[in-house]
């Protein structure tokens, strides 16, 4: 059955189709005969209890520089849609959170993927702390003294914003580095929220693995190797993707978290693993499926739509 699918995303014109997961999901939906509509979070509204968006009919093509066509914008009641993909990139701020409040008014009559209530209640750097034995030692605080004590205990640490994304604002403080006090002052000025200190994992030099799960089951992975001059492995900041298989430890991690993902209705999830430790559970806008398909041919977008269609 053909579905009406609205994609809530950053504007399609800004997408780098080579590595964009939202674009891959849209291509697969179109291939299956589903009708695509596009809108950005700024076009989402609620009036007298009716949730609507100014949507444009969308066609996509896997052609760099000519990857989309949009129709005329029309305001539509979103309950007329069968599926909405919640796919704008973080930051996970009040603007993002407000969209989840609006979309939960129409879910599950209109299936919103991922479930907006659980997206709001599962920030990736906090959700992961439900599995402390799978993580490196981690501190969430805004108390500078707590961070300094943590640093004395572990030496090498990572300091990063609680709601950042794409590697922005992530710092590696090696044992003996004298910049901690200045960084804490800067974080206190830039962020109202607490931030994260985490024991530095030397295994990151061999890569930070992104594992994709569909309905709580692992379906593919890629390794992201940091450059020689950077502590971060995110592809947004120059991390090099390479083909990877799951290790027994990574399968153990997936088996542990899978039931919680299913319970919360998370269809598409990306987790980050360094060595033997999970560092994040990404439920907002996980990426990596285009790279995985290029490496080993796994069409994760098809597995995603199989799971979505089974719910309609």
From Swiss-Prot:
Q: In which pathway does it act?
A: Sulfur metabolism; glutathione biosynthesis; glutathione from L-cysteine and L-glutamate: step 2/2
Q: Which cofactor does it need?
A: Mg(2+); Mn(2+)
Could you tell me the superkingdom of the organism this chain comes from? Bacteria
Annotated ATP binding lies at 151-207
Q: Which reaction does it catalyse?
A: gamma-L-glutamyl-L-cysteine + glycine + ATP = glutathione + ADP + phosphate + H(+)
**Alphabetized SUPFAM superfamilies for the sequence:** Glutathione synthetase ATP-binding domain-like, PreATP-grasp domain
* GO molecular function terms attached to this record: ATP binding; glutathione synthase activity; metal ion binding
This entry's Enzyme Commission designation comes to 6.3.2.3
One Pfam family, short name please? GSH-S_ATP
List cellular component terms (GO).
Answer: cytoplasm
Annotated positions binding Mg(2+): 280, 282
Looking up InterPro entries in the UniProt record yields: ATP-grasp, ATP_grasp_subdomain_1, Glut_synth_pro, GSHS_ATP-bd, GSHS_N, PreATP-grasp_dom_sf
Q: Where is the ATP-grasp domain?
A: 125-309
**Does the keyword Ribonucleoprotein feature in the UniProt annotation?**
no
Query: How is the cofactor bound here?
Result: Binds 1 Mg(2+) or Mn(2+) ion per subunit.
What are the protein's UniProt keywords? ATP-binding, Glutathione biosynthesis, Ligase, Magnesium, Manganese, Metal-binding, Nucleotide-binding
> What NCBIfam families does UniProt report for this protein, alphabetically?
glut_syn (TIGR01380), PRK05246.1 (NF003573)
Name the family the entry cites. Answer: Belongs to the prokaryotic GSH synthase family.
Instruction: Please identify the protein, giving its name as recorded.
Output: Glutathione synthetase
- Tell me the name of the encoding gene: gshB
């Amino acid at each position: 059955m053909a579905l009406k699918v609205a994609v809530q995303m950053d504007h399609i014109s800004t997408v780098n189709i080579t590595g964009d997961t939202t674009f891959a999901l849209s291509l697969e939906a179109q291939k299956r005969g589903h009708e695509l509509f596009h809108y950005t979070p700024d076009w989402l509204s609620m009036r007298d209890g009716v949730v609507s968006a100014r949507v444009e009919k969308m066609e996509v093509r896997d052609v760099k520089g000519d990857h989309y066509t949009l129709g005329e914008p029309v305001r539509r009641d979103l309950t007329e849609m069968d599926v909405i993909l919640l796919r704008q990139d973080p930051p996970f701020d009040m603007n993002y959170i407000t969209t989840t409040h609006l979309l939960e008014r129409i879910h599950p009559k209109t299936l919103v993927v991922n479930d907006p209530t659980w997206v709001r209640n599962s920030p990736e750097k906090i959700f992961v702390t439900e599995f402390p034995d799978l993580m490196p030692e981690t501190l969430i605080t805004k108390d500078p003294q707590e961070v300094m004590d943590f640093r004395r205990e572990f030496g090498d640490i990572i300091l990063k914003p609680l709601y950042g994304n794409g590697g922005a604002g992530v710092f590696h403080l090696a044992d003996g580095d004298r910049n901690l006090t200045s960084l804490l002052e800067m974080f206190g000025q830039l962020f109202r929220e607490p931030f994260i200190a985490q024991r530095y994992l030397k295994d990151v030099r061999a890569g930070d693995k992104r594992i994709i799960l569909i309905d709580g089951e692992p379906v593919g992975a890629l390794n992201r190797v940091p450059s020689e001059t950077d502590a971060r492995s995110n592809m947004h900041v120059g991390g090099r993707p390479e083909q990877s298989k799951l290790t027994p430890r990574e399968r153990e991690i997936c088996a542990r978290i899978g039931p919680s993902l299913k319970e919360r209705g998370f269809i598409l999830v990306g987790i980050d693993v360094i060595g033997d430790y999970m560092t994040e559970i990404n439920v907002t806008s996980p990426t990596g499926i285009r790279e995985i398909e290029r490496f080993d041919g796994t069409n994760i977008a098809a597995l995603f739509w199989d799971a979505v269609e089974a719910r309609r």
